[in-house]
């Protein structure tokens, strides 16, 4: 766990993601036609992006689904009430030097909290977390999915648009000459 926590601290965090379902309204912006959440919450699903972190998570994971394993990495996230997109259970782990708070709440009144231990949850039930105090809070959420990440879908749409525009430009040039 110590290595994993150290890697989470050293990680380059990007305050930009597509998880608008858990972001506060003031953290959501429109970038072109896409809603973007200005929160530290990033998907890690390919080992080659961050191999050392990926391997450290895998080494302590309570369950692993090979190519269907997905990881959400969060830093100081105060998630709004939401449901997760995956079907089935997820696992969550909290790390960091925060001193208190940050519990995960469910509509049925259940509340879980505690550092450095995995909790099995059903993300299909509405849930949110409390603010934490004193320091930085990291969370790792493991879940199973065979869906392509939203970023892949967006990148494919961008590529199709660029290709369409190129075809249209070439057509206009052909017609002019």
Describe each model-derived feature in a short phrase.
Residues 1-118, 124-177:
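Fe(II)/2-oxoglutarate oxygenase catalytic core
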